[in-house]
Amino acid sequence: MSERAAGILMPISSLPSEYGIGCFSKSAYEFVDWLKKAGQSYWQILPLGPTSYGDSPYQSFSTFAGNPYFISLEALVEEGVLTKAECEAVDWGKVKGSIDYKKIYEGRYPLLRKAYERSNVHENAAYQQFVKENSWWLSDYALFMAVKDRFDGVEWKLWADDIKLRWGPAMDYYREELYFDIEFQQYMQFKFYEQWMQLKAYANKKGIQIIGDIPIYVAMDSADTWAHPELFQLDEENVPVAVAGCPPDGFSATGQLWGNPLYRWGYHKETGYQWWISRLAYVFRLYDVVRIDHFRGFDEYFSIPYGAETAVDGHWEKGPGMDLFWKVREALGEKPVIAEDLGYVTDSVRDLVRDSGFPGMKVLEFAFDSRDSGSANDYLPHNYPVNSVAYTGTHDNETLAGWWGSISKDEQKLTREYLCDTYTPEAELNKPLISLIMRSAAKWCVIPMQDYLGLDNKCRMNTPSTVGTNWKWRIRKNQLSVKLQKEIHAVTLRYGRMNWTEDVEEAAEAEK
């Protein structure tokens, strides 16, 4: 890890934009500039994959593909394949600070289809190169999505057996029958990748590093499970034998039933973990640092019988441990990873995090919350090790303001005593709480944007085990104020976390 630094957690979807959802538009570039002026070194985002039912970025149709929602329509207007009038004619939803996913789904894809049909993409050398270089995942993904659209979006396990089980004649038939639909899917991935890499390059030139995020598991309804069932615990009909989740704890009496297929770790070991190596090699093209969700699943994973209604009957199974990361290191060298080691943590999980050398995560909200079944002392800021990343909360937690309102009076009293602060109004407590972890020993400190803004739980990103109200929050442009920027700059400077790197272009100009 580099020297002391700070960053902000801000999903791409939450950026301001003209057309219903944050994307790789001008606003994203302006946010990079804003981060730089605030003295930040890192921009942490959520997974970028195409989302399915529930809109969760942790349940994606592909491990490798990007979400077409994030393609900048403004950029396509500049290319001449869309018009501004066409984009403005779409109903993107009434609430500026929230995402209406139904309207996004109904509005974006027809526009992207128009852009594809006007693009003459088959004559584009860069497109052809992209398709060639990424054929190892793109070919299956594009076919998967084209067939899914043909079957009105139903899960692949409900498809006819010939294409569900990838029989040769059926594969050939659909590749020919859906040729233009497949090319459309490839076009969207090309534009996603092109625009994202341009944005990342801009951020890096400004001295901003991107912290990406990958789920440990893939979704059952994904191109990954359809194309490579051998990687997962599926039976001969490609039905899961067991699925992932979490055991009951202080937050949930029945645990969490995620429903993702589990890995067939024996097969991965036999193949030298090649799929994982390919996956991580690819994501390190997209991001500078990678946060791996549910890191404890590499030590032990919770296995729940397929068809169970809760996680109560699940049990722990042994994961690959350091064997996987040794192989990854042999293939890719040292890579900057953040291990999400929250929740139920055992000594063996701690050993794995330590042996990997990856920094773990420390979340302030857990320090004073008696509902947490782990050791709260681990989350008190004076105990944070240098090799860790400190957060007030994550996308799965309440906002600081929401958390303060949900904890007991005794916990509020304990928090104020720890802060040595009995006078700050509740509406402004986010500031001393943020300062608390900014001055900790943790080398990196990442604050969700909602906490800098002091927003309540109406702006919470996700409530685990719920569907329908999550992943919707968007920042308004006027909230990215110069005043807030200066406040963040001040606290970052005060605790030795400033980004002193020069803008690459400005430095080059100065030398002329």
Model-assigned labels for residue ranges:
Residues 26-51, 286-287, 437:
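Catalytic domains of carbohydrate-active enzymes, especially glycoside hydrolases
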Residues 1-39:
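Mature N-terminal, pre-catalytic/accessory segment of carbohydrate-active enzymes
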Residues 36, 196-204, 329, 353-354:
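Surface-exposed amphipathic alpha-helices with a cationic face
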Residues 185, 189-218:
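Conserved, well-ordered alpha-helix/loop/beta-strand core segments that scaffold catalytic motifs
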Residues 2, 11, 17, 55-193, ...:
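Alpha-amylase-like alpha-glycosidases and glucanotransferases acting on alpha-linked glucans and related
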Residues 46, 209-211, 215, 289, ...:
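Outer-envelope exported proteins of Gram-negative bacteria
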Residues 454-512:
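Structured C-terminal cap/extension of enzyme domains
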